Amino acid sequence: MIGITVRQNERCAEFIVGGHAEYAEKGKDIVCAGVSTLVNALANIIRELGEKDIIPLWMIWPDEDPFHIYAETGGNPAVNTVMDTFVTEFCQIAGQYPDNVQVQIIGERSEDDSR
């Protein structure tokens, strides 16, 4: 099973992704491919936002298992929306493949937090 832990608040977001979906054999596992695609897209977006100084602090540990991404969003509503979009996408995959993907969300932003 792939485990995805999301820690978030109005100032930061952290994604920890590890494990194996075991939906199909290696190289043919569409669940693993879907999660991997989202993780790589998230890492690329975080890296780009960091390099453009849109987010003040970011770290990516790509060679670790679990894969670990951390970003201080600075309370930027647009950046928080990007992070929330990835949370939604991970949850959708977990909803479609509950035996293969589990998402744990720790903390959340309230509407007032994005100011």
Model-derived segments and spans:
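N-terminal intrinsically disordered, cationic/polar leader segments
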Residues: 1-30, 40, 44-115
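Short, conserved glycine- and acidic-residue-centered signature motifs
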Residues: 31-35
